[in-house]
């Protein structure tokens, strides 16, 4: 009988938050297995999920032996520490890395994820909410684009860090799912996405996680 993988990741293909962790696992060459979560049919709201997997009712959830982690930034930090890869160099870079992870979670993917959900997966469109999120995204993506025009990696380091893996969450989903092309509209971000794609182990979210096309496992 084959040995169980070292890591398990509760995820589904449409989740950029889960993609961050799946991508990190692949980039560090971890022995891991995805566990599909039927998000769109309410699996994360089920009492069993909240009791046994994550009381917050969210994915991703990373399982490593008897340890269980939720929130993608926590998962990325844990994996970086375990592997010694994608870590910032020194205290200044560590704080800069944390600064951009927080900005990303609040202002970039924190808006991009809900915007994409409303445009593609919500039962009904909400033009007012979509317009609000799109306006915030225009400003916040512009901030990131200016940053990446000055430095190849988000934390200002000579190599990618978990800040870059965090930012990558939603940027590789098809442009038609957003109604605009991030890579073309923000050239420095576009060049950065190509640098991430060139890293050994990179895969598209729809290749890396189960559940695409929608309704499949």
Protein language model features and the residues they cover:
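GST-like fold's C-terminal all-alpha helical module
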Residues: 100-198
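Residue-level recognition of oxygen-bearing side chains
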Residues: 74, 188, 201
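GST-like domain detector, emphasizing the conserved glutathione-binding G-site
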Residues: 1-131, 135
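Active-site-flanking alpha-helical
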Residues: 24, 80, 170-171, 206
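Phosphate-coordinating loops and pocket residues in cytosolic domains that bind phosphorylated ligands
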Residues: 51, 198, 207-208
């Amino acid at each position: 009988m084959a040995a169980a993988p070292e890591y398990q990741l509760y995820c589904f293909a449409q989740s950029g938050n889960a993609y961050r962790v799946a991508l990190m696992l692949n980039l560090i060459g971890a022995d891991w297995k995805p566990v599909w979560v039927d998000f769109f049919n309410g699996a994360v709201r089920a009492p069993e999920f909240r009791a046994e997997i994550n009381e917050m009712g969210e994915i991703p959830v990373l399982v490593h032996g008897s340890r269980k982690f939720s929130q993608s930034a926590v998962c990325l930090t844990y994996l970086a520490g375990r592997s010694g890869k994608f870590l910032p160099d020194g205290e200044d870079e560590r704080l800069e890395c944390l600064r951009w992870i927080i900005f990303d979670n609040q202002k970039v993917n924190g808006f991009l994820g809900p915007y994409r959900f409303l445009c593609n997966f919500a039962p009904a469109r909400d033009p007012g909410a979509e317009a609000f999120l799109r306006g915030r995204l225009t400003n916040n993506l512009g901030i990131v684009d200016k940053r990446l025009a000055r430095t190849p990696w988000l934390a200002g380091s000579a190599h990618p860090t978990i800040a870059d893996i965090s930012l990558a969450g939603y940027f590789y989903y098809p442009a038609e799912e957003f109604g605009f092309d991030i890579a073309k509209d923000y050239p420095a971000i576009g060049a950065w996405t190509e640098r991430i794609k060139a890293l050994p182990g990179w895969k598209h979210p729809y290749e890396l996680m189960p559940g695409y096309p929608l309704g499949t496992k």
